[in-house]
């Protein structure tokens, strides 16, 4: 998928170059704008006959450039360059939205009357966009170390200085500006070609076979505390290991507590494929101790599906299940569009666009949904945003797999505690009855029970197996 992203990004830059060169047709459709002294932006002035065409082409060129940047996979130490190129795209879009009132250089009467604020905004956006593009050219040339890129950069700088001098002299600005825009368009095509021939970035392994109990690059991030019977904690969809710090602290005195981040979440490397129920079962099996030692699995939300499936598929390895506010596994038809989107998300999580969205909205969304800050900044990363979205899109498939598994594999006779938060009935009583489980209701708690009442979770784990369990 990373290669396809490069192709899409390159295509966007080529589209931006073509749309940004629409002024070439204006030499024939708008003869009122002087080719030698007239500024190219005058073709889109409000009083020109083809203003809508050239304004639209400028705006779409800017959006295509910004979209191209958003689709580029992240590369270390290049963020300033791509940020500058995205700024150029946005400034170009703004210039298309706010056109000149009249042909400033070609129309001698234009300067004699007052102009609107949109006229000044267009001039400001044009100047800032040019500065941003030149900065991107310099920064990318320094990173790529290509003489071709440096050639375009120096020619672009020279054309910009020549255009500024011609504007000050009010003679020859049209020729200089057209040369400048031509160089900029050719450089965008060069960027597209560079992306098409570049090597794919290395993708860290993220399969269950690559799990590393010490965390690190080779596998998911794992935190282990204490000694004693093993307790394996799996967070809800999109959750992180630090959400369970209070519960782990209460259990670490008597238990060996294992917390981890699924692929793409927390400090784990990004996922390479959409999540599935059986992948998560394999992950739990890889983290749990080998038979004959057994593990107590604590799961939250939809991750309770993973824990239940693990118990059905590996009954001899489970000592107890604690299901914290489990999500209902309802029978709904899996969505083909969701599957298609899910296949793209692991790659999209590594793009500059996902990074920008996560930086802007991630911490605020996390605080709104969970109610606590993000001390490690993990929700400011694109991979976490993509992984959380991927898990949400995979819910229907996971639920369907669990429902089939319930029909095929009996539930073992292990103690189960279902902790239910206050709020709407999510079928916890029915689940507890089906699993012969103890049902603990906490009407004063919200969904984040591990944060609001960690003692209740610890008590459910430390309680003697089978106590209060319905026969």
Name what the model sees in each region.
Residues 376-435, 441:
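Conserved serine/cysteine hydrolase catalytic core
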Residues 312, 321-354:
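Flexible "cap/lid" loop of the alpha/beta hydrolase fold
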Residues 259-298, 302, 314:
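Active-site loop/oxyanion-hole signature of alpha/beta-hydrolase fold enzymes
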């Amino acid at each position: 998928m990373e290669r396809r992203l490069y192709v899409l990004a390159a295509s966007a830059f080529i589209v931006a170059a073509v749309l940004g060169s629409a002024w070439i047709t204006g030499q024939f459709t708008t003869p009122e704008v002087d080719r030698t002294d007239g500024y190219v932006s005058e073709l889109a002035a409000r009083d020109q006959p083809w203003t809508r065409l050239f304004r639209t082409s400028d705006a779409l060129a800017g959006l295509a450039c910004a979209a191209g940047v958003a689709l580029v996979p992240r590369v270390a130490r290049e963020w300033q360059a791509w940020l500058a190129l995205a700024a150029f795209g946005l400034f170009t879009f703004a210039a298309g939205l706010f056109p000149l009132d009249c042909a400033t250089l070609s129309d001698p009467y234009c300067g004699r009357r007052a102009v609107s604020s949109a006229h000044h905004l267009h001039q400001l956006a044009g100047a800032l966009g040019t500065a941003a593009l030149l900065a991107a050219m310099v920064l990318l040339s320094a990173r790529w170390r290509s003489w071709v890129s440096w050639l375009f950069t120096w020619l672009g700088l020279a054309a910009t200085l020549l255009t500024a001098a011609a504007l000050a002299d009010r003679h020859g600005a049209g020729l200089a500006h057209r040369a400048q825009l031509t160089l900029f368009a050719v450089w965008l095509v060069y960027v597209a070609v560079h992306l098409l021939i570049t090597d794919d970035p290395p993708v860290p392994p993220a399969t269950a076979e690559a799990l590393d109990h010490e965390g690190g690059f080779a596998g998911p991030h794992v935190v282990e505390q204490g000694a004693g019977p093993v307790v394996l904690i799996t967070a809800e969809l999109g959750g992180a290991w630090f959400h369970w710090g209070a519960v782990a602290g209460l259990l670490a005195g008597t238990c060996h507590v294992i917390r981890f981040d699924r692929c793409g979440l927390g400090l784990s490397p990004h996922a390479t494929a959409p999540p599935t129920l059986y992948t998560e079962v394999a992950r739990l099996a890889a983290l749990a101790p080998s038979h004959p030692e057994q593990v107590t699995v604590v799961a939250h939300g939809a991750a309770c599906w993973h824990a239940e499936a693990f118990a059905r598929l590996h009954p001899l390895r489970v000592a107890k299940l604690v299901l914290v506010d489990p999500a209902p596994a309802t029978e709904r038809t899996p969505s083909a569009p969701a599957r298609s989107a899910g296949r793209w998300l692991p790659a999209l999580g590594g793009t500059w666009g996902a990074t920008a969205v996560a930086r802007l909205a991630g911490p605020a969304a996390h605080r709104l949904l969970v109610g606590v800050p993000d001390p490690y900044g993990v929700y400011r990363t694109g991979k976490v945003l993509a992984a959380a979205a991927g898990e949400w899109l995979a819910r229907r498939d996971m639920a369907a797999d669990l429902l089939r598994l319930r029909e095929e594999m009996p539930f073992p006779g292990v103690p189960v505690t279902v902790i239910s938060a206050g709020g709407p009935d999510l079928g916890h009583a029915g689940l507890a009855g089906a699993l012969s489980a103890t049902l603990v209701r906490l009407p004063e708690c919200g969904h984040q029970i591990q944060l609001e009442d960690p003692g209740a979770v610890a008590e459910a784990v430390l309680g003697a197996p089978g106590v209060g369990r319905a026969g």
